[in-house]
């Protein structure tokens, strides 16, 4: 899994050298941001249920047909609503994993790689998840560096969906 730290180490090792001062500074910067990233991951995790439920409601409000149309890809039944919440939760989990490792590796490997195919196969609209992620970003309650760190990965997911 790629992270800024593993990439710096891999580059140095491939060239048979020690880490350069620039690479060491990048690693140090990651460690300085790590506390804020872990704070964000903890907060998102402890508030996950509230954020997921609120994000699902935001999707139903912006796209009312999602809770009115019958079908496996819609939230017109309890099963459909549970699937919607599960999917939103998956995006939120990926954000927390990225926060913990300090890079987009988890999202790249476990989510983005097959995202377009999954959405097409199951007739899911990326705009639903963009709305959910925008809700989470606007309502996560984080501030300062913790918010910056979380928003970086939320924006990364939004851009992947756009």
From Swiss-Prot:
One of its GO terms (cellular component) is chloroplast thylakoid membrane. (2R,3E)-phycocyanobilin binds at residues 72-75, 83-87, 128. It comes from the Eukaryota. Contains one covalently linked phycocyanobilin chromophore. InterPro entries: Globin-like_sf, Phycobilisome_asu/bsu, Phycobilisome_asu/bsu_sf, Phycocyanin_a. It is a peripheral membrane protein. One of its GO terms (biological process) is photosynthesis. The light-harvesting antenna system in red algae and cyanobacteria is formed of phycobilisomes. These are composed of the phycobiliproteins phycoerythrin (CPE), phycocyanin (CPC) and allophycocyanin (APC). Cyanobacteria also contain phycoerythrocyanin (PCC). The phycobiliproteins all share the same subunit composition and organization with variations in the covalently bound open-chain tetrapyrrole chromophores. Although originally identified as Cyanidium caldarium, these sequences derive from Galdieria sulphuraria. Belongs to the phycobiliprotein family. Heterodimer of an alpha and a beta subunit. Dimers further assemble into trimers and the trimers into hexamers. The basic functional unit of phycobiliproteins is a ring-shaped hexamer formed from two back-to-back trimers contacting via the alpha chain subunits. The trimers are composed of alpha/beta subunit heterodimers arranged around a three-fold axis of symmetry. The phycoerythrins also contain a gamma subunit which is located in the center of the hexamer. This is C-phycocyanin alpha chain. It comes from Galdieria sulphuraria. The lineage of its organism: Eukaryota, Rhodophyta, Bangiophyceae, Galdieriales, Galdieriaceae.
């Amino acid at each position: 899994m790629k992270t800024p730290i593993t990439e710096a180490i891999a580059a140095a090792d491939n060239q048979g050298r020690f880490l350069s001062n620039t690479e060491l500074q990048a690693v140090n910067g990651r460690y300085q941001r790590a506390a804020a990233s872990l704070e964000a991951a903890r907060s998102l995790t402890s508030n996950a249920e509230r954020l997921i439920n609120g994000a699902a409601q935001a999707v139903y409000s912006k796209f009312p047909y999602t809770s009115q149309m019958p079908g496996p890809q819609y939230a017109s039944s309890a099963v459909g609503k549970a699937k919607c919440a599960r999917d939103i939760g998956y995006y939120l989990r990926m954000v927390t994993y990225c926060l913990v490792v300090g890079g987009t590796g988890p999202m790249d490997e476990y989510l983005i790689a097959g995202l377009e195919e999954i959405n097409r196969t199951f007739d899911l609209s990326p705009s639903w998840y963009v709305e959910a992620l925008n809700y989470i970003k606007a309502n996560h309650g984080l501030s300062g560096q913790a918010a910056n760190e979380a928003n970086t990965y939320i924006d990364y997911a939004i851009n992947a969906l756009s």
